[in-house]
């Protein structure tokens, strides 16, 4: 079986615990059939850091972009969106950088930066279209504006994935209409995710990805503890039950979906 963690933050795992280093993390992942990883950047300095940390590992892919909660800080550093956009363009052409992001909108933690977030989100989409690379979208308490901007910026030209999806079926359908994929995280294993699971059951298998978002959102039975890519197996297992499909078949389909979207 071959599983791909389509969204993780390998640099943020807790490497201070006994026997916890990147080699141990990868070994545990391989033992759980997780064999490729997309480690996602959240700002420019973070991108440089993850590329430096993991450059010798050929199973790790990268994205380059600015998380919506980091937009204000990055604008202060780069002064203009144009300067930042040029930096993202440059870095996104580096080997093994297969996507832009994570970008998007987060109104849960920061509603006073809506305009900056929206401007950055639009610019990521425009760059992605120029570079012919997909985008990784973060959306929290902002479904309506997220869809609106994706539609207005013709994001079907670059496509992408809505990571750690928690939306309703109507939102899912609009994303699918744009050619986007929907990624399931450990949230689907939570007891209070019944409505989400009903939605996931309706989404075509050929448009689903799986992710840990580690070190966040640990799935059951590890909820409340630090997450890691090895736990993707439990997300895949739960999703296979939801979709009433053998887990090996699910692994094959989600791996194929990942390779199709990210052109690898």
From Swiss-Prot:
The lineage of its organism: Bacteria, Pseudomonadati, Pseudomonadota, Gammaproteobacteria, Enterobacterales. Binds 2 divalent metal cations per subunit. Keywords: Hydrolase, Metal-binding. This is Uncharacterized metal-dependent hydrolase BU355. It is an enzyme of class 3 (hydrolase). Belongs to the metallo-dependent hydrolases superfamily. TatD-type hydrolase family. Its EC number is 3.1.-.-. A divalent metal cation 2 binds at residues 102, 138, 163. GO terms for cellular component: cytosol. A divalent metal cation 1 binds at residues 7, 9, 102, 213. It comes from the Bacteria. One of its GO terms (molecular function) is DNA nuclease activity. Pfam families: TatD_DNase. It comes from Buchnera aphidicola subsp. Acyrthosiphon pisum (strain APS). Gene3D superfamilies: Metal-dependent hydrolases. NCBIfam families: YchF/TatD family DNA exonuclease. Its cofactor is a divalent metal cation.
């Amino acid at each position: 079986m071959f599983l791909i963690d389509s969204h993780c933050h390998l640099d943020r795992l807790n490497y201070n615990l006994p026997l916890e280093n990147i080699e141990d993390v990868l070994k545990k992942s391989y033992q759980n059939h997780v064999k490729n990883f997309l480690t996602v950047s959240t700002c420019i300095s973070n991108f440089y850091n993850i590329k430096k940390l993991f450059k010798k590992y050929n199973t790790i892919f990268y994205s380059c972009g600015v998380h919506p909660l980091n937009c204000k800080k990055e604008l202060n550093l780069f002064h203009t969106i144009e300067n930042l956009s040029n930096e993202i363009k440059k870095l996104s052409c580096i080997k093994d950088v297969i996507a832009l992001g994570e970008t998007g909108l987060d109104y849960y933690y920061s509603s006073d930066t809506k305009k900056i977030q929206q401007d950055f989100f639009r610019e990521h989409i425009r760059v992605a279209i120029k570079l012919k690379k997909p985008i990784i979208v973060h959306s929290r308490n902002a479904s309506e504006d997220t869809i609106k901007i994706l539609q207005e910026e013709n994001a079907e030209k670059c496509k992408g994935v809505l990571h750690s999806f928690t939306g309703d079926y109507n939102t899912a359908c609009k994303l699918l209409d744009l050619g986007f994929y929907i990624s399931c995280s450990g949230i689907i294993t939570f007891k209070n995710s019944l409505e989400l699971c009903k939605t996931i059951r309706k989404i075509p298998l050929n448009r689903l990805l799986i992710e840990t978002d580690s070190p966040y959102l640990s799935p059951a039975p590890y909820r409340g503890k630090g997450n890691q890519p090895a736990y993707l197996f439990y997300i895949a297992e739960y999703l296979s039950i939801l979709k009433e499909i053998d887990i090996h078949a699910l692994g094959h389909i989600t791996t194929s979906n990942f390779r199709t979207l990210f052109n690898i």
